[in-house]
Regions:
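A generic structural signal for tightly packed, nonpolar segments enriched in small/aliphatic residues
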Residues: 28, 162-466
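Short amphipathic alpha-helical segment within the helicase RecA-like ATPase core
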Residues: 1-233
Length: 466
């Protein structure tokens, strides 16, 4: 309900108008939620209200929508009708999409292994106006986000590299994508020794890089445009030789969330039938400890010939991504976008509320941050000035993997990855500092947020490859 409409308008438009009018007088210009029981409903229904100031940001809309969903979930609602009053058509449509996104995210089941568990009874969602086509973007985005959260929630003994590969192949068949898995033997032929170094201590030989391809039927250009998505898929990260302490290791089954977000983005964009081709490259491995584990001070040659001085085995994500980015770039895509839960430094800089963005094209910065505001998945762009490279100068190799002191590691990690993307290809790197947040984020009620899918869908609504 808009909190800036006249009492006369409120009385005319809204059900239970006298109670609503009293609420509005009490609230003034505040934004708040309220619940009124509908005694006329024999099934014990409820009217759930939120008073919204005009001009609320998308993030604020999603937050408020999540509050309404929580009340509905507590009522064990089987049917929900979503409606807005007092807004113009543009604001009303945006609010309805926020409400729908919150209901879908809140009611979506995630993996559970409890012997007894309850499920949400929601069966029907009704919308006051519009057709399914008006909400196609929200539905496709939810499908991608739910997939990302589902995969990231799975225990590491369930989603190991082999099972992940099988799941991806099944999904590719379902969605009519092409699928190719580069095994360790194939990667050896590609001289992808940075990736292979991380995989050396794995108990099984099931690591590799999955390549999924969506071929747009509406891409009629002679020069077809292609987006390359890249995701970090470390199915479990012990830290390697530089072993993590327990507190830092306990949730490291989620270190593959970058790959899940890249996959969810592929799912959302392909279901929206975007007019460009997509290649999705997922780096799937574990980072284990053992006699074959890679060690500090090794010098490793990546697939593009760049030599790397290893400093810390727990900086494995940038090693696996180095070769994956190199392979993705060989097909000369129009843009490379990678997602990774890469650095604690980015969390330190932004907390878990936002994610960090980096690009080799400064002119993309405004569009990157605009997509964050429009989608409610907020990102902040960090500097990519070339003088940061001096911190990664190595006495024995082309580049150091990282520094010992960790200062600005989110920026240095991006500068490291930049060495594996040709200057001719635009590239965006998202460091997923908001991949997990206690209590959820915006409309997502779970700690694992699947952050990035909504942002990417909005970014490619506005981005032109021309």
């Amino acid at each position: 309900v808009a909190n800036n409409q006249s009492e006369k308008t409120l009385l005319r438009q809204c059900p239970r108008n006298s109670e609503l009018l009293q609420q509005q007088r009490q609230l003034g210009d505040q934004t708040a939620s309220s619940t009124l029981q509908l005694s006329a409903n024999k099934q014990g229904g409820a009217l759930l209200l939120i008073f919204v100031k005009s001009g609320a940001s998308c993030f604020e809309q999603l937050q408020m929508a999540a509050k309404l969903w929580k009340i509905a979930a507590d009522h064990r609602a089987e049917r929900i009708a979503l409606s807005t009053h007092g807004f113009d058509s543009i604001e009303s449509h945006a609010l309805l999409n926020s409400l729908l996104a919150a209901v879908l995210a809140g009611s979506a089941a995630l993996p559970t292994y409890k012997s007894k568990h309850t499920t949400q009874p929601l069966k029907v969602i009704s919308l006051q106006q519009g057709s399914a086509n008006d909400f196609a973007t929200t539905l496709a985005t939810h499908a991608g986000n739910h997939l990302a959260r589902w995969l990231t929630t799975l225990p590491p003994n369930v989603l190991d590299c082999g099972n992940y590969r099988h799941t991806l192949q099944q999904l590719a068949k379902q969605e009519s994508w092409q699928a190719e898995f580069l095994t360790l033997a194939a990667l050896k032929k590609h001289k992808a020794d940075a990736f292979l170094a991380v995989a050396r201590a794995n108990a099984h030989s099931n690591a590799g890089i999955m390549r999924l391809r969506y071929h747009s039927k509406t891409n009629k250009r002679k020069q077809r445009h292609t987006l390359a998505l890249v995701g970090k898929g470390i199915c479990f990260d012990t830290g390697g030789i530089n072993l993590k302490p327990h507190k830092s290791m306990v949730d490291m089954h989620t270190d593959m969330q970058g790959s899940a977000v890249a996959l969810g983005t592929l799912l959302a964009l392909s279901r929206l039938k975007v007019p460009f081709d997509i290649e999705c490259w997922l780096a799937l491995t574990e980072n284990e400890i053992g006699p074959n584990a890679y060690r500090p001070q090794e010098v490793i040659t990546a697939a593009n010939g760049v030599t790397i001085q290893v400093v810390h085995s727990d900086a494995e994500g940038r090693m696996a991504l180095a070769d994956t980015l190199t392979l993705a770039a060989r097909n000369n895509p129009n843009l490379i976008l990678d997602f990774a839960t890469l650095t604690g430094a980015c969390v330190g800089a932004l907390t878990e509320r936002m994610s960090g963005a980096f690009s080799n094209r400064p002119q993309l910065r405004d569009a990157i941050e605009l997509a964050g505001r429009n989608s409610g998945e907020r990102v902040w762009s960090f500097p990519m000035d070339s003088d940061f490279d001096s911190d990664l100068d190595s006495p024995i190799a082309d580049i150091m993997q990282c520094t010992m002191d960790g200062k600005g590691d989110h920026i240095l990690a991006a500068r490291f990855l930049n060495r594996f993307v040709p200057e001719t290809i635009p590239w965006i790197h998202i460091d997923l500092s908001s991949g997990s947040k206690t209590g959820g984020l915006a409309h997502i009620p779970t700690e694992i947020t699947g952050f990035g899918v909504r942002w990417a869908v909005d970014f490619f609504k506005q981005h032109s490859f021309n």
